[in-house]
Curated annotation (Swiss-Prot):
Subunit text: Homodimer. Interacts with APOA1BP and CLU. Component of a sperm activating protein complex (SPAP), consisting of APOA1, an immunoglobulin heavy chain, an immunoglobulin light chain and albumin. Interacts with NDRG1. Interacts with SCGB3A2. Interacts with NAXE and YJEFN3.
GO molecular function annotation: cholesterol transfer activity; phosphatidylcholine-sterol O-acyltransferase activator activity; phospholipid binding; protein homodimerization activity
Statement: the UniProt record of this protein carries the keyword Zinc-finger: no
One GO cellular component, as annotated: chylomicron
Record protein name field: Apolipoprotein A-I
Organism: Phoca vitulina (Harbor seal)
């Protein structure tokens, strides 16, 4: 269990560097990455859900029930936004502490990544060069056909398509050959990187388990602190949801009661 906790922590915290393995961009911090993903997801769900609620309220059934779902949805969105603001600093502190505790191990893994990157870069450059050559060759072969189409009549379109088809298949096959060659060239380095990570984690376990135990204890401590600090914000969320749920419940009961009265009157 300790090895699993440490492995997940290290892999997640080094994820931003590994994600930029073939790039020169400055990697995001783990918290920035999590925050961006969570924000995008919540915004998409919130906006999409509000659209559905608005469409339902605009329908004949929605107008008849008059549940005021849109008002409740906006209240809920406001409550969730407040929760995000309250928990944000607490979660930031958690990731900062976890980053600090695993700094040495992450530096060693990043060093391994950079070493492998330098070794495979020539293969990537060669692949890019060959791909550009193939595209240029394809463009040269296609150019006369395009001129022929412009000069010819519409009925030549089918003939042009028949000529382009084998050229496209040739480009696809040649590109597949280059990709397979690149995959074969990079395979040993991917395996080497995996073995290095496994070796570093194994060394931690064999070193008396002290370091691994310390990482696990500190991670558990940070998680407990995060849980305790988040309790007030979660309680605020619960309290904020109660009026929304109660309002929805009252509106729904009133709508059902009104519908029942209309049925009985018929």
């Amino acid at each position: 269990m300790k090895a699993v906790v440490l492995t997940l922590a290290v892999l997640f915290l080094t994820g931003s560097q590994a994600r930029h393995f073939w790039q020169q961009d400055e990697p995001q911090s783990p918290w920035d990455r999590v925050k961006d993903l969570a924000t995008v997801y919540v915004d998409v769900v919130k906006d999409g859900g509000r659209d559905y609620v608005a469409q339902f309220e605009a329908s004949a059934l929605g107008k008849q029930l008059n549940l005021k779902l849109l008002d409740n949805w906006d209240s809920l969105s406001s409550t969730v936004a407040k929760l995000r603001e309250q928990i944000g600093p607490v979660t930031q502190e958690f990731w900062d502490n976890l980053e600090k505790e695993t700094e040495v191990l992450r530096q060693e893994m990043n060093k391994d990544l950079e070493e492998v990157k330098k070794k495979v870069q020539p293969y990537l450059d060669e692949f890019q060069s060959k791909w550009h050559e193939e595209v240029e060759l394809y463009r040269q072969k296609v150019a006369p056909l395009g001129a022929e189409l412009r000069e010819g009549a519409r009925q030549k379109l089918q003939e042009l398509q028949e000529k382009l088809s084998p050229l496209g298949e040739e480009l696809r096959d040649r590109a597949r050959t280059h990709v397979d060659a690149l995959r074969a060239q990079l395979a040993p380095y991917s395996e080497q990187l995996r073995e290095r990570l496994a070796a570093r984690l194994q060394a931690l376990k064999e070193g008396g388990g002290a370091t691994l135990t310390e990482y696990h204890a500190k991670a558990s401590e940070h998680l407990s602190a995060l849980r305790e600090k988040a309790k007030p914000a979660l309680e605020d969320l619960r309290q904020g949801l109660m009026p929304v749920l109660e309002s929805f419940r009252a509106s729904l009961l009133a709508a059902v009661d009104e519908a029942t009265k209309k049925l009985n009157a018929q």
